[in-house]
Amino acid sequence: MASLTRKDRPMAAVKKSVSVKDVARLAGVSEQTVSRTVHDSPSVRPETKERVRAAMRELGYRPNFAGRSLRRGKFKTVGVAMFNITGTGNLDRMEGFAAAADKHGYAITLTKVDGHPYTLESASSRMSALPVDGMVVIMNRMPADFGTFEPLPGMQTVLVTMLEHPLCSTVDNDQFDCSRQVVEYLLRQGHKTVHFISCPERSLSGMQREEGWRETLHAHGIEPPRLVRGDWTAQSGYAAGQALADDPTCTAIYASNDAMAYGCIRGLESRGRRVPEDVSVVGVDDSLGDIVPDRRLTTVRFDNRRVGMWAVDKIAGAEGGASGVEHMLIPGVLVEGDTVRDLR
């Protein structure tokens, strides 16, 4: 049996892509009106917009924003690189990213930074392959190339860190000042010194909180007691509390985060030390108040949502020419609970 030649074969039905012209024809309007409706222009009457949108739905028309972005050289998108997506404060920062992006008509693209050690260059390379106008990097740890990193031309870059970079804008909560506030507060309450539960040495925020603790005690002529190293978890705080419970001179403990502070309280109590009657405890981040109902921890509250909004505002503002490097530190607020005793 002779086979069909290509010429003899019936052609498969080809679905024709829907164009602006098709939508305009069905809606009975101009192509310019369709374009204005897509961008929600106030110059188009509501009833006309509804007619155009009905035609778009009927025809299955989807605006080609990607093509428009390529033509304009702008994607209206900010890339966010995180080392630890579930880290304390990151969800609030994401809320800030989203709120600012919505305000500017931008979208957010999220990527996770891996690698040991990770670098800003690797984050930048990944972002350069994506349709983004700028990137935000949350620096939980010190990148190996922090001192040598140069952002790509046209890639507005904001780093979430207290460390200032000559070529990138930076924003963060003031990790040093939160420790100063805590130590000053406890000393004003009559405590002679402040013990400290630190965190993993690779953590940037933890290092800055430790530095603030040391320098504030030194400023008052007090030699800092030996710190206890934790790992951000309540379990490490529990172990630290048990260890510090055996020190009769310990009347005040400052933990690097709320999880360790709550763990510390349980550790102290397991050894018969009462909080705050025997030992005062203060944390940082105000992240667990809704989760631990039986205790109002004295802590420092951070505005991570504001951090996220500032970062995206900076990148979106670059579209209007505000592209200079800036550095922003947002102070925390000391929130008094029921875990500190006044010894005066």
Predicted regions and their residues:
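Glycine-rich phosphate-binding loop signature in dinucleotide/nucleotide-binding domains
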Residues: 59, 129-131, 189-191, 244-250
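Alpha-helical recognition/docking segments in bacterial nutrient-uptake
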Residues: 1-15, 77-184, 188
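N-terminal helix-turn-helix DNA-binding module of bacterial transcription factors
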Residues: 1-75, 344
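Flexible loop/turn connectors
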Residues: 225, 247-344
